[in-house]
Each structure stands twice: as C-alpha cells, then as structure tokens.
C-alpha cells in the first residue's frame, strides 16, 4: 500500500531518492527544500536540485526559513502525510516536526552509523582511508544522527574513488534502500535496531583551511586527502609557472613509486614526491579554469624537474 509522504531534501544527492519513491507509487504531498541561492557567473538565484525536480513533476515546493514556529508546524501537519523522508535537507528538525507524522520521519545517511555522524560522512570516509562505507535509513530522533537504524547497504571504498564518485554511488544505493524501507513501513514490517554505542565518530563539516596539500605526509595519505576533497573544495598546492606562483587544485591522482624530497617534481608526467612514495596527478584545475586531464594540462604548460610544489 503506497504511503503519503513529505519529502525533505536539497542537493543532487537527494534527487534519486525522490524519484525512486515516486516510481514505487508513493504520493509526495509536498517537498521541503532550502531556499534559492545565488550561483553561477551572474550569481543569479538558483533553486535547489530537489526544487527543480519537484517543479518539473508538479509537486508543491516549500522553502521555510524555520520550522520552529507554530505556523510552520501547522503547515507541516496540513499535508496529512503518513511519514516524512529526509535526505540532506540542511535544516535541523525540531521535536514537534519529528512527532507530527504518524509513522515518523526517516533519514537517509551516507555512512555506516555510528561511524561518521554529522555533515561530511562521504568526505571523511575517504580521507580516513575507510575500506568500506555505505548508507543507512534511520528513524529520526532529536540527536545528531542517533536514531534507530531500519536498513543498511555497504559499498567498498577503493583508492581510485573521489568524493564525487562515492557521492554518486551512494545516492543511487540510498535511493533504492529508502524505497525498500518505505515499502516495509507501508506493510508494517519495518524493523528498527538501536545504534551501537561503540565506534562513534563525527564527520565535521569540511573547512577550506584543511584543503592545502601537505607533501610531507605518506603518498597514500596524500591521495586520500586529495580524493576526499574532490571536487569541492578541492585539495590545492602552489607551483611556479612562468615566474608566477599559481594555485592548482589536484582532483584525481594515483600512488606510484618515486623517492624524492616532499613536493619535488620527479618527471615530466606530474609525479610529485611525498614523504613515502609519490603521487602521479591525473586530473587538476587551475584557478578560474575548468578541470582538465594532466596530459592536456602538460600540453599547454610543460613542467620538468627541477621544480617544487609548495
């Protein structure tokens, strides 16, 4: 039996879940998302990815600045939803909102809780060198990602994965998982399990100040740092090009052998020495320029030893 749902989400990560719920026959009474924000060269107001999709589908869209007022609660209740589905909404739900739907509010989280509670689980999993991560559906409570878990799916994390790659994989995996969870909820067969009190870690929001590459770390750590911050905010370093100090973001790389001083360019293929081993740059981006493959970059900006990356 299909459910009547409120969907609450904002970025691209949430769109596949919205589409899967509709494909499985659930009725979306309303979509809650964050307000339009300036973006692009002209800094024009742009609706969120979820808002764009909801408008295309003819679903009512709401962008409240707060959910803490009696009026916001009354409006939320007026939709007559059985449950709410929350995917990267970007606003904390007060207890009154959590209590409003008869069947509860259910969140899709991009980690294997209780590891990486918080804002940046995908980035932190890669940066920490986790061998696997996943997605979980939990019934929300007042804590930070502390609700009872309904379902989970795991995925291996490889050295080749960037945060963007893992984001896209988890978005699709999570959409299928939430559809299965809502089907079980509709049947009355959704089983909930308390989160473990052991292994709790927190995925702090990414700070741009931590994006600078430290070449004095082992090569594998540098790779994880680069991939965990790719494409945003982008791990960066500086190099000298035509007498000018240029900032470059490295978006994708691989670990290779190569002894040298940390930050030293080892060859003409963008191999850079680290404390232990080296990385070979595969994709990068100069400030104000689009991302490009290393080969294309080197065609326009040949680099040869001796030089150093700061």
From Swiss-Prot:
Task: Give residues annotated as binding (6S)-5,6,7,8-tetrahydrofolate.
Answer: 111-114
Disulphide connectivity of cysteines: none
Gene Ontology terms, cellular component aspect? cytosol
Q: What class of enzyme is it?
A: transferase
PANTHER family assigned to the protein according to its UniProt record, in alphabetical order: METHIONYL-TRNA FORMYLTRANSFERASE (PTHR11138), METHIONYL-TRNA FORMYLTRANSFERASE, MITOCHONDRIAL (PTHR11138:SF5)
Q: Any stretches that span the bilayer, and where are they? A: none
Record's signal peptide: none
Q: Which PROSITE patterns does the UniProt record give?
A: GART
Does the keyword Transferase feature in the UniProt annotation? yes
Q: What does this protein do?
A: Attaches a formyl group to the free amino group of methionyl-tRNA(fMet). The formyl group appears to play a dual role in the initiator identity of N-formylmethionyl-tRNA by promoting its recognition by IF2 and preventing the misappropriation of this tRNA by the elongation apparatus.
The chemistry this enzyme catalyses reads:
L-methionyl-tRNA(fMet) + (6R)-10-formyltetrahydrofolate = N-formyl-L-methionyl-tRNA(fMet) + (6S)-5,6,7,8-tetrahydrofolate + H(+)
Q: Which UniProt keywords apply?
A: Protein biosynthesis, Transferase
Enzyme Commission numbers on file: 2.1.2.9
UniProt cross-references to CDD domains, sorted A to Z? FMT_core_Met-tRNA-FMT_N (cd08646), Met_tRNA_FMT_C (cd08704)
Query: Domain of life here?
Result: Bacteria
The entry assigns this protein to a family as follows: Belongs to the Fmt family.
Tell me which HAMAP family the record gives. Answer: Formyl_trans (MF_00182)
Q: What is this protein called?
A: Methionyl-tRNA formyltransferase
Q: Which InterPro entries match?
A: Fmt, Formyl_trans_C, Formyl_trans_C_sf, Formyl_transf_N, Formyl_transf_N_sf, Formyl_transferase-like_C_sf, GART_AS, Met-tRNA-FMT_C
Q: Pfam families annotated for this entry? A: Formyl_trans_C, Formyl_trans_N
In alphabetical order, the GO MF annotations are:
methionyl-tRNA formyltransferase activity
